[in-house]
Design a protein with these regions (language model features):
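Amphipathic, Lys/Arg-enriched alpha-helical "gate/interface" segment within cytosolic domains
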Residues: 1-129
């Protein structure tokens, strides 16, 4: 599977790695998992350095709308995104939507600095705290 993830409940860190062609269905499964497991306030590291997608702009935008809608209804944790420089233009609208959430977020062009940064961020606060 081109998209796999690891959940560390002790450190409240969700690490996702995308490799190869990530389909809309695979990314939807990732978002469904976040919803079902209640991981919205976890710190998230998304390593897309080895990723590509055959999704068209309309599908990428639909994923951005889904994530943005989720951010408007519940608190979310910090996000570090590692993406190759040549892919930034493809995802720029979605990255802009994600940046609008009330949480720390940074985009990196290397997974190492992204990991270093996200580990320094505290997890998000739940609505109950």
């Amino acid at each position: 599977m081109p998209l796999h993830w690891t959940i560390d409940s002790k450190t409240k860190l969700l690490t996702a790695v995308a490799e190869g062609d990530v389909t809309r269905a695979e990314f939807e499964s990732y978002l469904d998992m976040i919803d079902q497991a209640g991981l919205h306030t976890y710190r998230k590291l998304f390593d897309g350095m080895g990723a590509d997608t055959s999704m068209g702009p309309e599908h990428i935008l639909a994923m951005g709308v889904r994530m943005r809608t989720s951010h408007q209804t519940r608190p979310v944790g910090p996000l570090a995104v590692a993406v190759a420089e040549d892919k930034v233009a493809m995802f720029s609208r979605v990255l802009g939507m994600l940046a609008a959430a009330t949480r720390p977020m940074r985009v990196f062009h290397d997974a190492g600095p992204a990991r270093d940064w996200i580990l320094k961020q505290p997890p998000g606060k739940s609505a109950a705290t």
